[in-house]
Amino acid sequence: MNLKISALEFVQEVKNGNISAEDFVAKTLERIQSVDDKLHAFLSVNEEAVDKAQEIDKKVKSGDKVGACFGMPISIKDNMCIKDSKTTCASKMLEDFVAPYDATVITKLKEQDAVFIGKVNLDEFAMGLTTEFSAFGPSKNPWNTEYVPGGSSGGSAVSVSAFECIASLGSDTGGSVRNPASFCSTVGYKPTYGLISRYGLISYSNSIEQIGPLTRTVKDAAFMLNIISGLDINDNTTLDDKNEDYLSEIDSGIEGKKIGIIKEMIGGSIDPAVLSATKDAIAKLESLGAICEEVSLDMVQYSVAAYYTITATEAGSNLARYDNLRYGYDFPVEGYEFNSYISKARKNFGPEVIQRMIIGGFVPS
């Protein structure tokens, strides 16, 4: 069984009867069991995945209508709600939290007969760029386990890169899909804000974060986007993409397309190897007929400061709900003295989260 096939190849193989979803999912679970002790991509594995794949195979054989995923095994970053499943955000604060509803992206994938293979690791509450800030231990880069996989969607990137699933969903605020995709040699895409519903995503920074796919190929990313994008009455920031087909023009080429090269982003302290790779990419785009023009965005110098100001402030507000009453551990509080209680409640957060909470309290004051 070739676990290295792309999403579109998997769909075609199952549709044609060359492979069964059940066998593929079973082999994927075996793969997880054999490699994930070293990689630690998964926080939980769905033991019912094979049963779900079996149901889909029955629909294929009987000629019933089958969703676009045809039983494809997909991993989900553990900050998205799947009903009746643990959703921990890689935090002790939510270690025992069981989601009471499905995120909209989960509902859409279920409608298209995806199989959720498990929930994957992240930096706690999606705050970090290495997946070292998980309360349940760091994930490892499958190309070299001495290296980090990037973050915060490190578990998503590792699971795709190590053939523990075909595709994954992550979330991206300041690079949390794109960064681990780069580190693990997968495709990571942060869609336009509002293109994908954030309903059921446990919030870090509402103004910036966005759910996005991690896949093996660009076509697979477009395939996933076709499924999970679109208007949602539960998220009033969503856009109506009018059932756009993101695969329709993917082979049409880029001749004549204008691409802006931000000059402030390719100078200064950029690493020489990164600069060289960027210049190679520009040359490749030009060889394919694109028009690459240098543009100036002088405000980009403030982007990191603006990012931390917005995200820390919103994170501080969002994290205020985790008070150990509605979420977190139960513990006796001596005399219910407030400062003692708050101090103990905050021990359920890791150092990176606490740091951002402190900044989030300081900045707006």
What are these regions (language model features)?
Residues 1-51, 287-289, 352, 358, ...:
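An N-terminal boundary/leader segment
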